[in-house]
């Protein structure tokens, strides 16, 4: 099996909805292969939501006007195409807009149901005079890519229901370039630089993750033809290699107190990997293993970038009573003294 160095992916946030991603090092030629695949998927296959049809009170078709409204119906529809929405519902949902003049009608006047969010409330829709009144019913659906109005026209639709073009894609622009990068003595490896700009309904990071998931699913079809087929295996990341090394460490290397060490040994926990597979509840079930021992273990694991199975990622050693983070020692009022192991003699006698 050929093993390739694992590439790294970094993100540089350029603006609120624009990021530049760098993937390197890639085997020669894979920069264009990956870049083109990601770009096409980002532009065409990221799920989103859009308005598919509208119904305006007193209007039968789009080639007309609304009394008291400056814009005609065609202009209103064009403005609504710019509406940025997201929906958590798989089925079509309905939103309502009701506004009495005079004044400007914006997307912020739309009342969305639960699970639907309007992300550009300042978007202009229409302008009303003193006698103007606008009531609009909007249907929002989830989809991908672009769907023309003719495909949104449902057979048997009620009179006055106007289908509109739907732009589901939440990605506005994607560009990429490939540069040469050095790996040891070789200078022909690829560095892929991907620039992604999105609407407010999704972040560039989430859009790229969605594209990656789609491609993995599709390429998986080819892999299933023969799961034993030989290919280029991506090596472990530095973090994964460090973690594997830490898992193999004996608990002797954690420099635990006598009580904690003996309790774990008696329970059959010999390596760090076996320790992190336990929960706090598991450890508390061990005889003579109390909360102070739990705190000690959590601190030692935190120093390695690890944690117990159910420990929160937000664990902060400085919040443990009696522990001095600056010196890495316990204060005398912590309940035991690391310099005096007499507290743990009972464990030795068990």
Curated annotation (Swiss-Prot):
Family the UniProt entry places it in: Belongs to the RNA polymerase alpha chain family.
Region (Alpha C-terminal domain (alpha-CTD)) location: 241-350
Organism: Mycolicibacterium vanbaalenii (strain DSM 7251 / JCM 13017 / BCRC 16820 / KCTC 9966 / NRRL B-24157 / PYR-1)
The protein's name: DNA-directed RNA polymerase subunit alpha
Lineage, top ranks: Bacteria, Bacillati, Actinomycetota, Actinomycetes, Mycobacteriales
Enzyme Commission number, as recorded: 2.7.7.6
Biological function: DNA-dependent RNA polymerase catalyzes the transcription of DNA into RNA using the four ribonucleoside triphosphates as substrates.
Bilayer-crossing regions: none
Catalytic activity: RNA(n) + a ribonucleoside 5'-triphosphate = RNA(n+1) + diphosphate
Subunit structure: Homodimer. The RNAP catalytic core consists of 2 alpha, 1 beta, 1 beta' and 1 omega subunit. When a sigma factor is associated with the core the holoenzyme is formed, which can initiate transcription.
Disordered, as annotated region: 328-350
UniProt cross-references to InterPro entries, sorted A to Z: DNA-dir_RNA_pol_insert, DNA-dir_RNA_pol_RpoA/D/Rpb3, DNA-dir_RpoA, RBP11-like, RNAP_asu_C, RNApol_insert_sf
Residue segments, region Alpha N-terminal domain (alpha-NTD): 1-226
One cellular component term from this protein's GO annotations in UniProt: cytoplasm
Positions with biased composition (Acidic residues): 336-350
Domain commentary: The N-terminal domain is essential for RNAP assembly and basal transcription, whereas the C-terminal domain is involved in interaction with transcriptional regulators and with upstream promoter elements.
Keywords: DNA-directed RNA polymerase, Nucleotidyltransferase, Transcription, Transferase
């Amino acid at each position: 099996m050929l093993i390739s160095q694992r590439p790294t992916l970094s993100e540089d946030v350029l603006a609120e909805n624009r990021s530049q991603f760098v993937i390197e090092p890639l085997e020669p030629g894979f920069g264009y292969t990956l870049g083109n695949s990601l770009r096409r998927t980002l532009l065409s296959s990221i799920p989103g939501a859009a308005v598919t049809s509208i119904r305006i009170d007193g209007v039968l078709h789009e080639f007309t006007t609304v009394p008291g409204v400056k814009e005609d119906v065609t202009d209103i529809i064009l403005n609504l195409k710019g509406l940025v929405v997201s929906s958590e519902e798989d089925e079509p949902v309905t939103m309502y807009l009701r506004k009495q003049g005079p004044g400007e009608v914006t997307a912020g006047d739309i009342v969305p149901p639960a699970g639907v969010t309007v992300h550009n409330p300042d978007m202009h829709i229409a302008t009303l005079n003193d006698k103007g009144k606008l009531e609009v019913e909007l249907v929002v659906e989830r989809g991908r890519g672009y769907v023309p109005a003719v495909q949104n026209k449902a057979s048997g639709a009620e009179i006055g229901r106007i289908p509109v073009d739907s732009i589901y894609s939440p990605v506005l622009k994607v560009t990429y370039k490939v540069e040469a990068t050095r790996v040891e003595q070789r200078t022909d490896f690829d560095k892929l630089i991907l620039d992604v700009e999105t609407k407010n309904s999704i972040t560039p990071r989430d859009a790229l993750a969605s594209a990656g998931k789609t491609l993995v699913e599709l390429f998986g079809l080819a892999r299933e033809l023969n799961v034993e087929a030989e290919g280029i295996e991506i090596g472990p990341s530095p973090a994964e290699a460090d973690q594997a090394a830490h898992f193999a460490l004996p608990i002797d290397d954690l420099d635990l107190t006598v009580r904690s060490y003996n309790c774990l040994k008696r329970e059959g926990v010999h390596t760090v990997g076996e320790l992190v597979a336990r929960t706090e509840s598991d450890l508390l079930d061990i005889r003579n293993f109390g909360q102070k021992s739990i705190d000690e273990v959590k601190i030692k694991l935190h120093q390695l970038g690890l944690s117990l199975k159910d420990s929160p990622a937000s664990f902060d050693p400085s919040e443990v009573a009696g522990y001095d983070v600056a010196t890495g020692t316990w204060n005398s009022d912590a309940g035991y003294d690391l310099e005096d192991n007499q507290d743990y003699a009972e464990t030795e006698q068990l």
